[in-house]
Amino acid sequence: MKKVVVGLSGGVDSSTAAAILHNQGYEVIGLTLWLMKGKGQCCSEGMIDAAYICEQLGIPHEVVDMRDVFQTHIVDYLVTGYGAGITPLPCSQCNKTVKFGPMVQYAREQLGCDRIATGHYARISYDEASGRYQLLRAVDRNKDQSYFLYDLSQDLLAASLFPLGEMEKADTRRIATEHGLKTADKPESQDLCLVESNGSMRAFLDKYIAPKKGDIVDTAGKILGQHDGVHHYTIGQRKGLGIAAPEPLYVVELDAVNNKVVVGDRTKATQEECTVSRVNWVSIPEPSTPIRAAVQIRYRSAPEPVTVIPLENSRVRLVFDEPQFSITPGQAAVWYDGDKVLGGGIIEQFSN
């Protein structure tokens, strides 16, 4: 019998993924990662629900303590990034270093199993010609999570199953209901796990970064107001600046070194290109010449036509066909060919 380890968060998606594989004849082992120190939904209610689902399905359930890893790779990563004036994207980092990597390692070393599965909405295929595993968008475009999975290595893709990739979200809930799963009607998470457990990103960051007053200035250096910490702002932000101006102003730069928030009109928050580092080429090998693609510079943004120019040291330059508003350092840029994820990386800081 084929064996698979299913990552269970205690939500409807991962629960349904486990039920589907169980019905397909897999020997399913449920695995929950204990991520956050202290109290929080994903390490209390979620863990309890995951255990209950395993009992319903008649499968074993294991819990792995990943709190120290999560603290180092996600909490510290976020705090350091925001303190340096960037807006980090923790989810792709978490998927690679906290979830998929450790899950595959645990499955192989502790359970003698080469396959894992999760409730992510994405698809994986194997291309015989290139000998590469390809990451594809989910059938349900509204739920597609391929953007957050761009950093998975070929080894991790080869070991992973996404049972929900060919399904609509409504089908997931229907299957969960048909199986009588406790999580069938469980509401979806609406924000980052850290935000949900702390109330807001501001509240989370204020636990780690002390307020530090500084100037809000325009691009010419004129002081327009005061702020209480650059970590409270993000590129493109318009609301909550606390300054009066005859025209709308947006955050165009976060100068953490000089403790300044730089604002300007919309044109100043618009860029024709950006540089991306820590690039992972997914469905194709790294090209030696520029390629055409469609890029997303944030999760819910529409794909935009772009020329991807390879640089040295796992970096690329993205040149957009049309200037883009609010390109945010620390966020992921992920480029596609249709449904296929070609590659992605982290947007670097730039100066206005």
Swiss-Prot record:
Listed Gene3D superfamilies: Adenine nucleotide alpha hydrolases-like domains (2.30.30.280), HUPs (3.40.50.620), Translation factors (2.40.30.10)
Q: Which domain of life is it from?
A: Bacteria
Listed GO MF terms: ATP binding; tRNA binding; tRNA-uridine 2-sulfurtransferase activity
What role does this protein play?
Answer: Catalyzes the 2-thiolation of uridine at the wobble position (U34) of tRNA, leading to the formation of s(2)U34.
The record's catalysed reaction(s) read:
S-sulfanyl-L-cysteinyl-[protein] + uridine(34) in tRNA + AH2 + ATP = 2-thiouridine(34) in tRNA + L-cysteinyl-[protein] + A + AMP + diphosphate + H(+)
Tell me which family the UniProt entry assigns to this protein.
Belongs to the MnmA/TRMU family.
> Which UniProt key words apply to this protein?
ATP-binding, Cytoplasm, Disulfide bond, Nucleotide-binding, RNA-binding, Transferase, tRNA processing, tRNA-binding
Give the site residues for Interaction with tRNA. Answer: H120, Q331
User: Which InterPro entries does the record cross-reference, listed alphabetically?
Assistant: MnmA-like (IPR004506), MnmA-like_C (IPR046885), MnmA-like_central (IPR046884), MnmA-like_central_sf (IPR023382), Rossmann-like_a/b/a_fold (IPR014729)
Q: Region Interaction with tRNA: which residues? A: 143-145, 298-299
CDD domains, per the entry: MnmA_TRMU-like
Query: Cellular location of this protein?
Result: Cytoplasm
Write down the species. Answer: Trichormus variabilis (strain ATCC 29413 / PCC 7937) (Anabaena variabilis)
Q: Does the keyword Cytoplasm apply?
A: yes
**Gene Ontology cellular-component annotations:** cytoplasm
Task: Specify the protein name.
Answer: tRNA-specific 2-thiouridylase MnmA
Cystine residue pairs: C94-C193
Quote the record's binding site residues for ATP. Answer: G7, L8, S9, G10, G11, V12, D13, S14, L33, G119
